[in-house]
Amino acid sequence: MLLRFRGPDGTVRIAVEANETFGQLGDKLLKLLPENLDPRTLTLSNAPSGGEVKLLMEIARAKVSQIGLKNGDMVFINYKLLDNLPNGNSTTSTSTTHSSHLTSSTNRLNGSAVLPESIPVNVPAQAVTSPSEKIKNPWEVVQQSDLDNRLDKKDGKIPRKRDTKMCRHGEKGMCDYCMPLEPFNAQYLAEKKIKNLSFHSYLRKINSATNKPELGSSFMPPLTEPYYRVKKNCPSGHPQWPEGICTKCQPSAITLQPQEFRMVDHVEFAQASLVENLLVFWRSTGAQRFGYLYGRYEEYTEVPLGVKAVVEAIYEPPQVDELDGITLNKWESEKDVDEMARLCGMERVGVIWTDLLDSGAGDGTVICKRHIDSYYLSSLEIAFAARLQAKHPKPTKWSDTGKFGSNFVTCVVTADETGGIAISAYQVSNTAVEMVRADIVEPSADPAVMIVRSEGDDDSDTSARYIPEVFYRKINEYGRSVQENAKPSFPVEYLLVTLTHGFPSDPKPAFMAKNSFTIENRLVIGQEQDIKDVGKQLGLDKNGQLTQSSDGVLAVSDFHLLCYIYSMGILSKEEMALLCRVATQHDLADGYQLIATPGWANFLAILQSTG
């Protein structure tokens, strides 16, 4: 077949066989690309932008036929160029080294030989760098959120009143019975039934053990993200994996245990109508619905040094909804919606979807599928949540890599044990994120278990994947804690962190429009956003003037309306920023300033012309 490859330096055509590997294809491709190309950075994609991007080295052992390429297909490539090499230095030595590598069965953990065609694309030797990309002095260069900076300045101590029975001192004194407790005090957490430490409480706990200023030792970042992949450019001098491996570059065995902390403690929905809109769709169609949560992070005072995600809006991207699942389509306006959220002082904080099945009793009850004897979040959903958390890392100066975990949350609207509709909020552990990123685990047909991949699978490029030993501890039938091998599968609860959720007792939502604007991507139930609906939402008459029934500045206080106006492209960036300020802060002075702008006048004229 003939394949076309379009990149920064033009388009090339290569003839390949369906049974050839991408490693063989890469060797042909490199001959047609610039000589100073860095093969480590060569990526393939099915679209010029927004498509699925894969490093060539990651799929070097996959066959062309497995990817689904056909004769004449266009593949989009991208790469980076190396600095010009000095005279006399070339990559021939590297090529010679690759060709002379041993291919004995001892080079593969499962005993199979490393064939020449399965060797990765030749790459020039580079300086030894850490695969985890550690940052020197992260506390000087990493930009944390304002919330993290505020919590860092707090001591987090839990105050206690004077104990009338045990304290022998006066009102101004202090003893062991009334002195403030550390935010990670186990007894206090048990009394308050707090299952997981907050992130900043956990940070205080491990920092007190890692850094001891009284000893005069230099500061060390106390946080380290798990890393379960083979380290590249091992200083021991042996061939790179999969041809060679040693104890310095291979990951250690993994022992799964419940994560003792959570990055976010609570999810707060600013108003009940946010979730109700999802339920309206389910009641109309019986199909499930998915949405992205937009809001902000605030301090959560119910737990020591806690953090909560405050959800102000739910945006429903393009999707195909079914009775038992959801398929997400390509989201063209993703960057625009994120920009609108930023102008409103928000960010993407999580996802939410429904999993509801009517009981058929006619009383509004639903069937409870998620409970202690089945599962709470399926293995497929955990893998999905892990990928989303990996895309939204949390920047922190307390980690040697400048990031640690994620504040991204996952919510499911499902049935509780009484048949009522309830919300459950979760995160997956940092271990789960890295295991998914390292391709160690994969979802199972049984939603309650996660499968540990096998290194020698023939139907994928697992030959380049190192699978460390994975264990977990459980209580056996005799009440003893025993260690079990996680292969071939293990329970998903070892990867799950449970959050609390709720609604404010005194709601003060940012978006307060009395009449909600049509929600996007609901054409399947006959709802479509239209420019005429904008005039109705704003309370305009046929002449483009505000009617007496207009809600004033509150009329524009709707996130879906703002996104639609932004998509029209009429207002400038400054005018959109002003509109978002009016929508979220509800200031009349800003409203009059918006009305006086030329962009708003053009906008009203367009509304008037469309009737």
From Swiss-Prot:
Primary localization: cytoplasm
Protein location: Cytoplasm, Perinuclear region; Endoplasmic reticulum membrane; Nucleus membrane
One of the GO BP terms on file: ubiquitin-dependent protein catabolic process
GO CC terms of this entry: endoplasmic reticulum membrane; nuclear membrane; nucleus; perinuclear region of cytoplasm
Residue spans of biased composition, Low complexity class: 90-106
CDD domains for this protein: MPN_NPL4, Ubl_AtNPL4_like
Membrane topology note: Peripheral membrane protein
SUPFAM superfamilies: Ubiquitin-like
UniProt GO molecular function: ubiquitin binding; ubiquitin protein ligase binding
Residues covered by region (Disordered): 89-113
Gene3D superfamilies associated with the record: Cytidine Deaminase, domain 2, Phosphatidylinositol 3-kinase Catalytic Subunit, Chain A, domain 1
Stretches assigned to the MPN domain: 267-404
The entry's keywords: Cytoplasm, Endoplasmic reticulum, Membrane, mRNA transport, Nucleus, Protein transport, Translocation, Transport
Pfam families associated with the record: NPL4, zf-NPL4
Function field: Involved in the import of nuclear-targeted proteins into the nucleus and the export of poly(A) RNA out of the nucleus. Has a role in the endoplasmic reticulum-associated degradation (ERAD) pathway.
Family classification: Belongs to the NPL4 family.
Protein name from the UniProt record: Nuclear protein localization protein 4
Organism: Sclerotinia sclerotiorum (strain ATCC 18683 / 1980 / Ss-1)
